[in-house]
């Protein structure tokens, strides 16, 4: 097993210092008779371009400013109050769920939030303004990450001492990825990571000990992967130089929402593309060609599927940067059908374990970039 040094509290210390620097700048502006402001990059694909060389989206520099004016008085107050709350969390080494942060604001008088989405948006704006992850500011989502199993040891420092989880000794269960993966120390001698769209397929592969037969780490994405899941996979990939193979349903959602988010990021978190995206990831299936080659049971494309494909071909810089993806999506459009991972059960419950995945993993020419 390759062991890395334990992760320190440095990210939270950096976040705290950035909060202090921003507050100091606003104070200096006030003392000079200027309106204090908080500048942040615009968090949307309109402020990004796909850099094929890097394999991820890059911000193009569009910014917005939150200024202490009559029109922005409330949102500015909400932003500074949230900044203060984040500083308190870091100073006390505490955390707040996004839901808790919303309710904390109910004690802020006129600066309170009317709904949680507005509160979440301010937290993500601060994340963008400071250039740090919201988790490093002390804010975590309600949901945990996904499940993981395989040749991996996870070491976590707890108040009771060092906790070691051996992901090969969990019976039929799996390790649940926590919200903040920064504090985890990871040891592995696996050959690759297999990220799986559905919990059902993950359960099948785990039950058959696919990870043991192929010396790989299995990660359940549970649909579009949560931030914690993406950061966990990215750490394993970068720290242990592990290839990341992705196994989704053969449909536009699996390709352009789930796989695309893991590989190059999402529009909402475009400012974090370098911290969350995994450009080296590859999709091994289910591809449109697999549907033909393996004669899989199918369902007709829905209207929303067709719309998603056409939009991707026309407007998605990721798709437009890869001829292989353009060809695959046009092929699916011509076929007019989609297929689920579980459709491989047509040939028996163990077919995906004994035949399909071993063949796909071995033949890189069938992968999509």
From Swiss-Prot:
Annotated catalysed reactions: ATP-dependent breakage, passage and rejoining of double-stranded DNA
Cofactor, free-text remark: Mg(2+) is directly coordinated by Glu-197 and Asp-249 as well as indirectly coordinated through 2 water molecules by Asp-251.
Keyword list, A-Z: ATP-binding, DNA-binding, Isomerase, Magnesium, Metal-binding, Nucleotide-binding, Topoisomerase
A cellular component annotation (GO) from this entry: chromosome
EC number in record: 5.6.2.2
Residues that, per the record, bind Mg(2+): 197, 249
GO biological process entries: DNA topological change
InterPro entries linked: Spo11/TopoVI_A, Spo11/TopoVI_A_N, Spo11/TopoVI_A_sf, Topo_VI_alpha, TopoVI_A, TOPRIM_Topo6A/Spo11, WH-like_DNA-bd_sf
Keyword DNA-binding: yes
UniProt family annotation: Belongs to the TOP6A family.
Summary of subunit composition and partner proteins: Homodimer. Heterotetramer of two Top6A and two Top6B chains.
Function of the protein: Relaxes both positive and negative superturns and exhibits a strong decatenase activity.
Protein name (record): Type 2 DNA topoisomerase 6 subunit A
């Amino acid at each position: 097993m390759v062991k890395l040094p334990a992760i320190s509290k440095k990210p939270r210390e950096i976040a705290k210092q950035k909060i202090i620097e921003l507050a100091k700048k606003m104070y200096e502006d006030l003392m000079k008779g200027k309106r204090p402001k908080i500048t942040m990059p615009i968090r949307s694909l309109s402020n990004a371009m796909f850099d094929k060389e890097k394999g991820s989206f890059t911000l193009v520099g569009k910014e917005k400013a939150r200024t202490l004016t009559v029109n922005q008085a409330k949102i500015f107050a909400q932003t500074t109050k949230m900044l203060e709350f984040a500083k308190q969390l870091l100073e006390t080494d505490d955390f707040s769920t996004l839901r808790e942060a919303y309710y904390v604001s109910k004690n802020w008088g006129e600066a309170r939030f009317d709904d949680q989405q507005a509160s979440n948006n301010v937290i993500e704006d601060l994340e963008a303004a400071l250039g740090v992850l919201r988790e490093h500011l002390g804010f975590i989502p309600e949901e945990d990450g996904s499940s993981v199993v395989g040749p991996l040891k996870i070491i976590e420092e707890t108040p009771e001492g060092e906790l070691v989880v051996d992901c090969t000794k969990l019976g039929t269960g799996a390790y649940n990825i926590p919200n903040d993966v920064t504090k985890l120390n990871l040891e592995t001698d696996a050959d690759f990571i297999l990220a799986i769209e559905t919990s059902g397929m993950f359960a099948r592969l785990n039950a058959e000990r696919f990870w043991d037969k192929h010396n790989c780490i299995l990660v359940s994405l549970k649909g579009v992967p949560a931030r914690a899941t993406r950061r966990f996979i990215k750490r394993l990939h970068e720290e242990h130089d592990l290839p990341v193979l992705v196994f989704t349903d053969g449909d536009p959602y699996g390709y352009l929402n789930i796989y695309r988010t893991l590989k190059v990021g999402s529009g909402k978190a475009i400012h974090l593309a370098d911290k969350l995206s995994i450009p080296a990831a590859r999709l091994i299936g289910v591809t449109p060609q697999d549907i033909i080659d393996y004669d899989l049971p199918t369902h007709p494309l829905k209207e929303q599927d067709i719309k998603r494909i056409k939009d991707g071909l026309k407007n998605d810089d990721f798709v437009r940067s890869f001829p292989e993806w353009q060809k695959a999506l046009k092929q699916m459009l011509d076929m007019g059908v989609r297929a689920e991972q579980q459709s491989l059960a047509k040939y028996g419950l163990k077919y995906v374990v004994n035949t399909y995945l071993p063949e796909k993993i071995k033949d890189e020419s069938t992968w999509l970039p």
